[in-house]
Amino acid sequence: MSRIQAPATSRMQSIARNPAVIALFMTLALAGCASKKNLPNSAGELGLNNATPGSQQDFTVNVGDRIFFDTDSSSIRADAAATLDRQAQWLQKYPNYAITVEGHADERGTREYNLALGERRANAAKNFLVSIGVPADRIRTVSYGKERPVALGSNEAAWAQNRRAVSVVVQ
């Protein structure tokens, strides 16, 4: 039995020492660790489109209830503007509803700094919605800073998910 295993073991060792095999393995390992910037903005993008029209679930699933921000920024990105446009259309279609825009930040920075950043993010979303026709009195803002993370972890993937503004439908 040892004669049968010995050639296979020696063949595996020679393959493992081959620089091309090592380079291929490292490339595959690094590609598996690459992060995707195109995170879904809504549950609808995940294929969860069965919601009652005019409900919070409809808003979340079919419109998108959250937008994301770059690090230390409250500027509305192009992908966020598209989501806010859909939110404005939904609010025009359902005039009996209002929203609360919750501003959030990742874990980096002080509590006070992140509360202020969350407030700037919530206000940026509100101001954008108002600029495209949503009455200001239908939009309330609140900042939670870093106090309500949706993703735990001290890495870029978690931080990216926590740099957000979430619109919650209220009646």
State where each predicted segment sits:
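C-terminal motif of bacterial Sec signal peptides marking the signal peptidase cleavage site
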Residues: 29-32
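Periplasmic OmpA-like peptidoglycan-binding domain that tethers envelope proteins to the cell wall
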Residues: 104-170
